[in-house]
C-alpha cells in the first residue's frame, strides 16, 4: 500500500508541476498556488488537512500559496455508518442505540478528519457527536512518512523558498498528532470556558465527559444564528455595531489577557444566541506566552506612537536571528512602514495587513518571528473579515489601542512585586557604586596605552578573497615580466652554457615565462573576469 501510495503522490505532484519536490528533473512549468491546491484536493483527506494546516503558516509558505490553500474545503464524502458504529463501540464498549435516545445517521458535517452528527441523550439533552474517521490516523501518518522520505532523498535545494521542507514536515507531524487526539480539543473547550466564564456575552458549549475519548467528542448543541446572517440578526432585533464591538473585545481579551485564543473564528464557528456570542469548534487554538503578550502590547504601543526604535526592540527581542541583521536596513524598513500609516486614519488600518508587512520585513532582514504569531495573523484576518461584514464602520484599531493602553496600566499594578523591586533596586545600587572605580580604571588604561578597541567586520570574506586573488595575479605578472626582461638580457649578452651558439639559460627563462603566462591566462579565463 505504501509503494502504491508513493507512486500516486509522485504522479499527482508531477502532473501539477510540483515534481521538483520529488526530483529536480521534474520541474514542470505549471507550478502555481492554484495547482498546489488542486493537487492536494486530488490526493485526498490527508493532503486537504495538510494544506489547511500550511495555510496557517505564512512563515513556511509565500503569501500567494497561503491564500490559495485557505480555499481548501472539507467537502469529504461521509463514512459508511456501519464503520462509524463499529468505531463507537470500540471506543465506549456501548452501541449508539444504547447510548442515545436519537442519533441522526446522516452527518451534518463531513470533514477530512471527522464527521459530526446530531443526537439526543437519554435525559433529553440535545448534543452533537464528533467521530473520527476510521483509519484516518494511520492514513495521515503513512502519507506524512512518505512525504518525509521523499524530501530526505530528493536533491532539490528549494532555491525559490517555496517551503522549508524539514521544518514544514516537523510542524505537520505535531499539528496532525494534536488534531487526531480529541482529548486536546476537549481540554481546549474546558480551558476556553473557564477563561471566559466571567464574560457575560460569551458562551461556550459543555462536554459530556463520560462519552468523550481520543476519537469521540460529545458536547452540548448550541442552536444559534450564524454571525454573518445579517438579515436574520436584524429581524431578531440585534444591534450589529454592538455585536462587532463585543466580538472585538472578546478577541482582544483572548489574545492580550488570556494568551489563549480561538484559532479558526470564521462565521461558521461564531453563533449568536440570546445576546451571547457562542464559540464552537475548538480543534485549532492559539497560545501566546506571558513574555510574548508583553511584547505584543509594546508593539501595539509602538504603532500607536510611531516609535520605530521600540518596534525594532520588540522584533529583536522576540525574533531569532537567521543570519546577519543590518539594523540600519531594519530601521529604514520600519520607518518606511510607519510613514505609510501616518497619513492613514486609524479606522483604515488593518492589523492583519500590518502584521503581514512586519513578518516580511523581519524575513528580509534574516529574523524569524515566533510561530505563535502565525496563528495570530490568520485568526486576526478572519476576525477582521467578520467585523467588516457585520459592522463596516467599526475599526478594530480604534478599539485595540485604548484597550492595550488600559491593559498596560492595569498590568503594572497587577504584576507589581515588592520583592523583585527590592532585588532590582539592590542590583542597581551595587552596579552604580562600582561605576566610579570602573571609570578611573578605564581612564588609566587609556593614558598608559593599554586600552584596546575591538572591531568586528561582517561579510568581508568575499571582498578580501577577491583582493588577495588580484594581488597574487599582479605579483605573478611582475615575476613573468622580470623573467622575460632577464632572459632577453642574457640572450643579448649570450652568456652561460650554449646550445647551437644560443644561451640555454636565456631560452629556459623564456620557456618558463611562457608557461607561467599561459597558466595566468587560463586562470583569468576560468574566473570569467577577463
UniProtKB/Swiss-Prot annotation:
SUPFAM superfamilies: Protein kinase-like (PK-like). Pfam families: ABC1 (PF03109). InterPro entries: ABC1_dom, Kinase-like_dom_sf, UbiB_kinase. Belongs to the protein kinase superfamily. ADCK protein kinase family. PANTHER family: CHAPERONE-ACTIVITY OF BC1 COMPLEX CABC1 -RELATED, PROTEIN ACTIVITY OF BC1 COMPLEX KINASE 7, CHLOROPLASTIC. This is Uncharacterized protein in hydrogenase 1 5'region.
Amino acid at each position: 500500500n505504501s509503494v502504491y501510495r508513493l507512486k500516486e503522490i509522485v504522479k499527482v505532484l508531477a502532473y501539477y508541476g510540483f515534481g521538483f519536490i520529488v526530483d529536480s528533473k521534474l520541474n514542470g512549468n505549471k507550478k502555481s498556488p492554484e495547482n498546489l491546491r488542486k493537487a492536494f484536493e486530488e490526493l485526498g483527506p490527508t493532503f486537504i488537512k495538510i494544506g489547511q494546516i500550511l495555510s496557517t503558516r505564512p512563515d513556511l509558505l509565500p503569501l500567494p500559496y497561503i491564500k490559495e490553500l485557505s480555499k481548501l474545503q472539507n467537502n469529504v464524502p461521509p463514512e459508511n455508518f456501519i464503520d462509524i458504529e463499529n468505531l463507537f463501540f470500540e471506543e465506549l464498549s456501548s452501541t449508539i442505540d444504547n447510548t442515545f435516545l436519537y442519533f441522526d445517521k446522516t452527518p451534518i458535517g463531513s470533514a477530512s478528519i471527522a464527521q459530526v452528527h446530531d443526537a439526543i441523550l437519554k435525559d433529553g439533552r440535545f448534543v452533537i457527536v464528533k467521530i473520527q474517521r476510521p483509519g484516518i490516523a494511520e492514513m495521515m501518518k503513512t502519507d506524512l512518512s512518505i512525504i518525509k522520505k521523499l524530501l530526505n532523498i530528493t536533491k532539490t535545494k528549494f532555491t525559490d523558498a517555496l517551503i522549508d521542507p524539514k521544518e514544514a514536515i516537523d510542524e505537520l507531524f505535531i499539528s496532525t498528532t494534536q488534531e487526531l487526539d480529541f482529548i486536546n480539543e476537549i481540554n481546549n473547550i474546558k480551558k476556553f470556558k473557564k477563561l471566559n466564564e466571567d464574560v457575560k456575552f460569551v458562551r461556550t458549549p459543555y462536554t459530556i465527559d463520560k462519552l468523550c475519548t481520543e476519537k469521540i467528542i460529545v458536547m452540548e448543541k448550541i442552536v444559534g444564528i450564524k454571525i454573518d446572517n445579517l438579515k436574520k440578526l436584524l429581524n431578531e432585533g440585534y444591534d450589529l455595531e454592538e455585536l462587532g464591538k463585543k466580538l472585538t473585545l472578546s478577541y482582544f481579551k483572548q489574545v492580550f489577557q488570556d494568551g489563549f485564543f480561538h484559532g479558526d473564528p470564521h462565521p461558521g464557528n461564531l453563533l449568536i444566541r440570546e445576546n451571547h456570542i457562542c464559540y464552537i469548534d475548538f480543534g485549532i487554538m492559539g497560545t501566546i506566552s506571558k513574555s510574548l503578550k508583553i511584547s505584543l502590547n509594546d508593539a501595539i504601543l509602538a504603532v500607536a506612537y510611531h516609535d520605530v526604535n521600540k518596534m525594532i526592540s520588540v522584533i529583536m527581542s522576540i525574533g531569532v536571528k537567521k543570519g546577519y541583521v543590518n539594523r540600519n536596513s531594519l530601521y529604514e524598513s520600519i520607518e518606511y512602514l510607519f510613514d505609510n500609516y501616518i497619513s492613514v486614519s486609524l479606522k483604515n488600518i488593518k492589523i492583519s495587513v500590518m502584521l503581514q508587512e512586519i513578518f516580511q520585513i523581519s524575513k528580509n532582514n534574516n529574523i524569524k518571528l515566533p510561530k505563535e504569531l502565525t496563528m495570530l495573523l490568520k485568526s486576526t484576518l478572519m476576525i477582521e473579515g467578520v467585523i467588516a461584514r457585520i459592522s463596516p464602520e467599526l475599526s478594530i484599531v480604534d478599539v485595540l489601542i485604548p484597550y492595550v493602553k488600559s491593559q498596560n496600566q492595569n498590568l503594572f499594578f497587577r504584576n507589581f512585586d515588592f520583592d523583585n523591586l527590592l532585588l532590582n533596586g539592590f542590583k542597581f545600587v551595587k552596579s552604580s557604586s562600582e561605576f566610579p572605580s570602573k571609570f578611573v580604571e578605564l581612564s588609566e588604561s587609556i593614558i598608559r596605552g593599554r586600552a584596546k578597541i575591538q572591531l568586528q567586520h561582517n561579510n568581508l570574506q568575499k571582498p578580501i578573497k577577491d583582493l588577495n586573488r588580484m594581488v597574487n595575479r599582479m605579483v605573478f605578472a611582475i615575476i613573468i615580466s622580470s623573467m622575460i626582461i632577464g632572459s632577453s638580457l642574457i640572450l643579448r649578452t649570450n652568456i652561460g652554457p650554449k646550445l647551437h651558439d644560443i644561451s640555454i639559460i636565456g631560452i629556459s627563462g623564456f620557456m618558463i615565462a611562457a608557461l607561467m603566462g599561459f597558466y595566468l591566462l587560463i586562470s583569468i579565463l576560468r574566473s570569467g573576469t577577463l
